[in-house]
Amino acid sequence: MKIGIINTKIRTVFSAFACMIAASLVCTMPARAVVEININKGVIEPLPIAITDFLSADQLGSNITSVIAADLERSGLFAPIDKGAFIEKISNPDAAPRFEDWKVINAQALVTGRITKQPDGRLKAEFHLWDTFGGQQMIGQQFFTTPDNWRRVAHIIADAIYERLTGDKGYFDTRVVFVDESGPAQKRVKRLAIMDQDGANVRFISDGRALSLTPRFSPNRQEVTYMSFEGGSPKVYLLQLETGQRELVGNFPGMTIAPRFSPDGQKVVMSLLQDDGSANIYTMDLRNRTTTRLTSSQAIDTGASYSPDGSQIVFTSDRGGRPQLYVMGADGSNPRRISMGDGSYSTPVWSPRGDLIAFTKQSQGQFSIGVMKTDGSGERLLTSGFHNEGPTWAPNGRVLMFFRKAAGAGGPKLFTIDLTGRNERQIQTPNFASDPAWSPLLE
């Protein structure tokens, strides 16, 4: 199944610059309005926003509205107003609303829209974002797509609203690959699955006959690398999401652990278990299948993750006694320890923004998800509990997804949390779920 579903172009004009999104667009926008969210503040008060049901001949308009509202509310930055409080009934979403009616209910922003079916069977989705207190339109767009892609349209609209009001890219039109876990604990079946970031449209991409772990997206969103125990020994595979075809990256004599793509998609970094019981970090060039050894310690070096520019790698090593975080050059040069707190650190992953590293920390019987600056300073624990593990970044670097197994629970579940640590949400999945990996924005 192709990830880049909506293949026509959208252009949204923002006062002084243009931004490309994936779909077809007509847009008008006046000068920047006053209403906005400063996401760099320590404590953020969610912005009251009114999202009216998109006009349509069937339930689809209301369904799209619900997805938009859920996306924005789940971010923790927006507070959708209950529709029962609305005074004005929108009959023409293209016309300026009665701003006073929306100011009365403290709606600082207003979304109106319409869904119509075209003669060729496609859907036309139109929406407008209004600054109610400034009395002006902030965005006006229209999109064309096939009916089965209506959820993507909703996510793209939510992304446009998020970006316009925060100044940051959204993260709603994305997918997550993860390990689905079903069956009793003693006979747990683990297979790879992919879903929208909100838990919708789950699709299994492995059959569960062999244990599959650590799935990771390629930068182009079209491939997933993962570890499979097919045949009894761990091997690293590349899976083409569109065709379902897969290929063996390498059949190494020892265990292969935690493969992950480089930012340019040309290499995979991973750990290989050595004969002496140590594990060292290697890269494989996918163009010619050559491997390069980056670490040569007698320790367990694993969990490697590239910086966004590809110049550095963060990894976990117990070379100092217990697992800690280290950063080295992409060629293995100048390894240096960056974690200095009590406890053990693992599963580091570099933020897409380049400013933070997320990690799992085990200390005093608790597993925590935390972040630190790339030099190890400013460590903050966002959530702690019986077992939290495996953070992965949203593509805008503002939200993390991870998995949690609560004490006494039958298996793990997926959760998201923002960088304030105050907005934690569970992602509903059909079964137990672990080891998520977030995709870049879709195209």
Curated annotation (Swiss-Prot):
Subunit: The Tol-Pal system is composed of five core proteins: the inner membrane proteins TolA, TolQ and TolR, the periplasmic protein TolB and the outer membrane protein Pal. They form a network linking the inner and outer membranes and the peptidoglycan layer.
Biological role: Part of the Tol-Pal system, which plays a role in outer membrane invagination during cell division and is important for maintaining outer membrane integrity.
Name of the molecule in the record: Tol-Pal system protein TolB
One GO term (biological process): protein import
Annotated signal peptide: 1-33
Native source organism of the sequence: Brucella suis biovar 1 (strain 1330)
SUPFAM superfamilies named in the record: TolB, N-terminal domain (SSF52964), Tricorn protease N-terminal domain (SSF69304)
InterPro entries: 6-blade_b-propeller_TolB-like, PD40, Tol-Pal_TolB, TolB_N
GO CC terms of this entry: periplasmic space
Xref: NCBIfam families: propeller_TolB (TIGR02800)
Entry superkingdom: Bacteria
Keywords: Cell cycle, Cell division, Periplasm, Signal
Subcellular localization, as worded in the UniProt entry: Periplasm
Record family assignment: Belongs to the TolB family.
Pfam families: PD40, TolB_N
